Design a protein with these regions (language model features):
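Immediate post-signal peptide segment of exported/extracytoplasmic ligand-binding proteins
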Residues: 26-33, 49, 67-88, 107-109, ...
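A conserved helix-loop-strand patch within extracytoplasmic ligand-binding domains
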Residues: 81, 159-208, 311
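Short, polar/charged alpha-helical segment
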Residues: 86, 93-118
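Short helix-initiation/N-cap motifs at beta->coil->alpha
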Residues: 116-127, 215-242
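Ligand-binding "clamshell"
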Residues: 147-159, 173-174, 246, 251, ...
Length: 326
């Protein structure tokens, strides 16, 4: 019994010792776990900080790149704007502004922007050109331009011819030149310049002749020979198409015929030729101040206006009422 009791006491002491030894070991493990956790936390934190720094650096780099791209784009746009030259040209609506519109794209390819300013009268385009509000205009022929310069003491010059609007003979009660009969009545424009052109057409046909050399100042009073005893009725140019039923023939301006729905190509019995004195004299021109005559952009405009592309455009669109000339 005593021996048994001694064994039990010894066993208890051993168990106590074992328990004491186990506790520090568990504590060490716990401490090690804590240390590992702390180390892992620090590593995660450090990695997060590094990631944040890299993200911030990338963001700053991206922002710098975007700023640089924006500045580059702005510089390129500025450079393009500086390279592109703008010219303003005044014009009457038909056919002048329409012809200029066909020049916009060809000029754009050369770095020239063409702005078209439309006018509805024949005074303002020259005034705007003289004052510098526009660089050039397109609506008039040289005699009109010269008269304006004389009256206004201005220095506008022609940069070149573009087109003419041929005057032609049209049938009224008589539908063919061969139908001409004695005493036929022919309608003529009542303004001096257009009437002279009309009389030159009749001379070309052999219907009348003049005492001296005929020119663009010829009048009815200059007629010397009238073998068919023709009668002449003077009317405002725009009234002639409406009066065809009351006339045997009428001599009508190309633009007036166009406005009246008359086909110059199909309906005219005879028209002025491009090399005639009238066509060359009354061809419509581009005009500008003398100091702008050598403007490269205006020279480029003239080159485009004289190109085959624009000549084809004019011939197709206006059915003979407007004819390209250079």
């Amino acid at each position: 019994m005593k021996k048994t009791l001694s064994l039990l006491v010894t066993l208890l002491l051993c168990l106590t010792l074992l328990a004491g030894c186990a506790a520090p070991e568990g504590s060490d493990k716990a401490e090690k776990k804590n240390e590992t956790a702390e180390k892992t936390s620090e590593e995660v934190k450090e990695a997060a900080e590094k990631g944040s720094e890299k993200s911030s650096e990338a963001s700053e780099q991206s922002s710098d790149q975007a700023k640089e791209a924006t500045e580059k784009s702005s510089d390129e746009a500025k450079e393009t704007t500086e390279k592109e030259q703008t010219i303003k040209v005044g014009a009457s609506v038909t056919p002048h502004a329409e012809i200029l519109q066909a020049c916009v794209e060809p000029l754009k390819k050369q770095g020239i922007k063409l702005e078209i300013v439309e006018f509805t009268d024949y005074v303002l385009p020259n005034e705007a050109c003289q004052s510098g509000d526009i660089d050039a205009n397109y609506f008039q022929h040289v005699p009109y331009l010269e008269n304006y310069n004389k009256e206004k003491n201005s220095d506008l010059v022609s940069l070149g011819k573009v087109h003419y609007e041929p005057m032609g003979l049209y049938g009224g009660r008589l539908k063919s030149i061969d139908d001409l009969k004695e005493g036929a009545t022919i309608g003529l424009p009542n303004d001096s310049s257009n009437q002279a052109r009309a009389l030159l057409i009749l001379q070309k046909l052999g219907w009348i002749d003049f005492a001296g050399k005929a020119g663009l100042e010829t009048t009815l009073l200059d007629i010397k020979e009238n073998p068919h005893k023709l009668k002449f009725q003077e009317l405002a140019a725009e009234q002639l198409p409406r009066s065809l039923d009351d006339l045997d023939y009428a001599v009508i301006n190309g633009n007036v015929a166009l406005s009246a729905g008359i086909s110059v190509r199909k309906d005219a019995l005879y028209i002025e030729s491009a090399d005639s004195e009238a066509a060359q004299t009354f061809a419509n021109v581009i005009a500008a101040k003398k100091e702008n005559a050598e403007n490269p952009a205006l020279k480029a405009l003239m080159d485009v206006l004289h190109s085959k592309e624009i000549a084809d455009f004019i011939e197709q669109k206006y059915d003979g009422a407007v004819v390209p000339i250079s």
